[in-house]
Amino acid sequence: MIKTLRACVLASLTVLPLLTALPAHAAEMPLAEGIRALPFAAESRAGYERTKFKHWVDEDRDGCSTRAEVLIEESRTKPVVEAGCKVVSGTWFSYYDQQTITTPSALDIDHMVPLAEAWDSGASGWTAQRREAYANDLGSSRSLVAVTAKTNRSKSDQDPAEWMPPSAEAHCAYLADWVSTKFRWGLSVDMAERDALTGQAEGCGSTTIDTSAI
């Protein structure tokens, strides 16, 4: 299976096809129904170390790390990319706080479901290879997102019971991205998280999630 080619990489770089796990037509489900369908389990952080999720790698060996790939993909203008796939400028919209950013150093690449939360929710039982794939998931635009460093660090490893984006306009999209990511990777929710997701989703009308899984 072939990944969508990430755009705007330096012409001097050899660009290889990227692999994807997404089906041609992803199945959709109403957000509220998706929340109810997520597996339920208590969380445990025993044994967690961030280093158990290797990132940012150059999976396709095109010279660009996962971080660079996301910056290139999400820039709303053609990014300037220097030798070594160093992204030096572009235009990014941080949807968590509705900010437009033109300096890549002001951005973090957020794991939609943080690494620690993924560990708590089932990744503790994965192989090292699957954890690496999770931490560098370019197969879904929901998995990794460029946002202001300030909001990413405010979020840290918290779930929606503990943190939501500062912009109310972002909440429904954030919930959909969160639930879709949990579906994609077969991750569970605990009681507080499920209750928070359910309550927040009440104002999200026809918002849908992607239920494709890998």
Regions found by a protein language model. Give the residues of each.
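Short, motif-level signal for alpha-helix interfacial/capping segments enriched in acidic residues
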Residues: 38, 84-98
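N-terminal carbohydrate-binding/catalytic regions of secreted carbohydrate-active enzymes
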Residues: 49-88
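Domain-level detector of nuclease and nuclease-like folds
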Residues: 92-214
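Secretory targeting and sorting signals
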Residues: 1-26
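N-terminal module-boundary/linker segments of secreted carbohydrate-active enzymes
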Residues: 24-61, 193-195, 206-214
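Active-site-proximal flexible loops/turns
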Residues: 20, 69, 118-121
